[in-house]
Amino acid sequence: MAEDLINSFMNGPDENGRFGIFGGRFVSETLMPLILSLEEEYEKAKVDPDFWAEMDDLWKNYVGRPSPLYFAERLTNHLGGAKVYMKRDELNHTGAHKVNNVLGQILLARRMGKTRIIAETGAGQHGVATATVCAKFGLKCVVYMGAHDVRRQAPNVFRMRLLGAEVIPVTSGRGTLKDAMNDALRDWVTNVRDTFYCIGTVAGPHPYPAMVRDFQSVIGKEVRWQLAEQEGEGRLPDTVIAAIGGGSNAMGLFHPFLDDPSVNIIGVEAGGKGVDEKMEHCASLTGGRPGVLHGNRTYLLQDDDGQILEGFSISAGLDYPGIGPEHAWLHETGRAQYVSITDKEALEAFQLSCAMEGIIPALEPSHALAHVTKIAPELPKDHIIVMNMCGRGDKDIFTVARHLGFDMSDTEEGRDLEE
């Protein structure tokens, strides 16, 4: 089936914002005019050379793009199989891939005359990126963050506040990313006149999934020419791998390769404590089924009555009970493969990256790296894997320390996490 559809993989979504049966826009009447206005503005921006010239300038001179494509030589030798490259998006300004998309959305917000920006965040990286760009352009910034995530991502909370953002802890549900997104949507409904909702992932109502994907696709576009420079003209990766919560970093890497049938595409979900009936994971594609959440139809963790389940992951950025609709479509068509990695496996990969390459990864890309360590030894030495190192691990050191048994309670952040 995947071979039959190969010419259409990059054409979505359709005019209704759907990827097959997934996507769409399930929003209130209050929000629909704003959603349609946003779509209209983005369609204009997409063909506006001045918009992309400003984006290119900001990506280069503010973010620091292109991010390096790094051959992980020691890790490759240690694994003893395929060549492993890391796309180093953790070296971006703000420390993750999130800023790629935030810049685009806030440029759109300014074109629409919006003066107040709201965002949701889980790991804090989207919140930091949004606060950063708002500070640059002098815009008011409000970030919704689950109370549980506020505790486990304390360094990023301080960064957001230092940058001038108001951080609102969300206490409903489990206090994680889903709950933060719920409250951000409620805010947007009541403040449509001056407020722009800057969504951090390839989820939400159309046009967000496509718009965020387009801004993040700079990742995969760079990989295409960077790998050709290092491995020879025309050389493509044999496999691309990225971690998936909502799926923006993965979609950014995957999309430019969707029409290259020789490129294997693998998304790595958060397996938490194991993908089983206990639902102590956030592997929506591996352990969920289709439903509607946050304005779009996609795969979700839900019970027999259709109620959304909380899920679980050591990684705040992957702790989301759904997935972007384009990923759901790629899963259904067979163009991409989706697997899960447990917390334990991600922690092992985190430590391996530190020891082998001197790179402290965030817990999110540690999931992708864990799958690399599983498959690379079984692949030939001329097989090239590119994984997206989508964030750095500064924000996760207290979480990792606690799970590895290190006592950091004498630090202020450590005391906060103990409480």
Curated annotation (Swiss-Prot):
Residues that bear N6-(pyridoxal phosphate)lysine? K98
Tell me the route in metabolism or biology where this protein functions. Answer: Amino-acid biosynthesis; L-tryptophan biosynthesis; L-tryptophan from chorismate: step 5/5
Domain of life of the organism encoding this protein: Bacteria
The prosthetic group or cofactor this protein requires is: pyridoxal 5'-phosphate
An annotated Gene Ontology molecular function: tryptophan synthase activity
For this UniProt record, give its keywords in alphabetical order, as a comma-separated list.
Answer: Amino-acid biosynthesis, Aromatic amino acid biosynthesis, Lyase, Pyridoxal phosphate, Tryptophan biosynthesis
Stated family: Belongs to the TrpB family.
> Which purpose does this protein serve, as stated in its record?
The beta subunit is responsible for the synthesis of L-tryptophan from indole and L-serine.
Q: Which NCBIfam families match?
A: trpB
Its assembly, as annotated, is: Tetramer of two alpha and two beta chains.
Q: What is this protein called?
A: Tryptophan synthase beta chain
Instruction: Give the organism the record lists.
Output: Ruegeria sp. (strain TM1040) (Silicibacter sp.)
